[in-house]
């Protein structure tokens, strides 16, 4: 049976795991790392890079390097958070055909789902390389506080990457699964998850294989990227004070500042001070300029204090919704790379009144939990029951623009709820159902998920027709809505597709595009491998020719030299097939040389053996003993 993989599709880094017996195992990528940067680059040569290779070239190609795209997924172009991001990233964020935020590279538009799919493809290939078989099914994690549009867009990304997404699971819930799988005693835990781009807090009751989420809260635009950007701003401001040059308009300099900020942030988790040293950051008429400064942990903490404090309000809300006090939490589990920051650990300790649990790897635990959920769905992991919740209230717009909730936040999913509404005007023959998600009292202040019309209502005074609206949330947290006129039995049912979102045709086109790219990538990889093999063969043949050329005939030597020359010429082109053919030719004509080498080494071995035998002969003096003389 094919394996189901678990993928943590992160803002900054992604991770893939699989069940290995009874345990979840994190899989190393082709670079030997257990996490992969969530970075995609488009080079001037038309090449597409994903992961570490993409991140490495970001400084020289800032506009062609896309990072933190998870912050755009499922968001409209006019979203205030997107506006904020546009000012901070060096790549182009543009308006998609459907009104969503997309990115543009070399004149081509890509949806965030497409970019995410490229990262998912890399994780899929990583798993396939380790398992030695094709992988087609996955469990993918999302922040608990993701809305329906963001969940749907993540599921679309999986489909574009060629994966059947069996389940979308919340990141804190996945972390709790990995943390609590072997724990039999009942516990109430809080999972504090501060990653690269999002913050989640979930309160769960776990014990004896049951994982029940009591409440969840968070902020989908708060994470390590914000901490980095705060430092970038500080570095740029200090440099401007000193040199009078604004680096914020220089995309190349900004990319170098971002890398320096990330490095400084990590170093300050284990040391009190770090030095930022960026030579030749810019230049003016007087010559090149260098950026050098010291940054203390205390200064860094003061710069980001408001960001750290922003995590506390969601914690309070989650506890309130769960009906608990901070002191009633048995264990606080830290998840996400940002929780390595001492200030965050201190704030968590102060709020919950206990030391946070540090026994899980914050970068890997979410992927491990996703793999466990994959095992549960496949039937390999027994006696585990996961009860998650919907993070935001769902409802429709009613008379006066009021938001009428049908499903309250933190309701256990899957769930279904119906309510009967009526018409607002006499003889109204159609109603428009506008579906919203959020916590504000007026519908317009919440996130519009979709709208549809129920038509053909028979003429009647207002308030008489009975229209039953039913919400159905599946285990992925994705919404389906139907409206039915109880008088006529007419029904309209839709699977929510965000007011932007990708249509089935869009997804199909992107799947084809991804498959073509996969074929191109494979072809390119095969070309590189063939080139490497050819160069290695040329090197070894030339070396052998120097050493044993006198052991073959002049004609044979000429054939070998001609084959080497042909292969070198083929390497100057880009035809992989020609390189392979010329390699085979060289291998064939070199057989006589190989034979000569073998015979030569055999002869040398025989000579050595003879010498060894001669060395073993010991000259001895014998004394004749006459037995008779006794």
UniProtKB/Swiss-Prot annotation:
This is Chaperone protein DnaK. Gene3D superfamilies: 1.20.1270.10, 3.30.420.40, Actin, Chain A, domain 4 (3.90.640.10), Substrate Binding Domain Of DNAk, Chain A, domain 1 (2.60.34.10). Keywords: ATP-binding, Chaperone, Nucleotide-binding, Phosphoprotein, Stress response. It comes from Bartonella tribocorum (strain CIP 105476 / IBS 506). Residues 598-630 are annotated as: Disordered. Acts as a chaperone. The gene is dnaK. It holds the Pfam family HSP70. Induction: By stress conditions e.g. heat shock. GO terms for molecular function: ATP binding; ATP-dependent protein folding chaperone; unfolded protein binding. The modification Phosphothreonine is found at residue 198. Belongs to the heat shock protein 70 family. Residues 608-624 have a biased composition (Acidic residues).
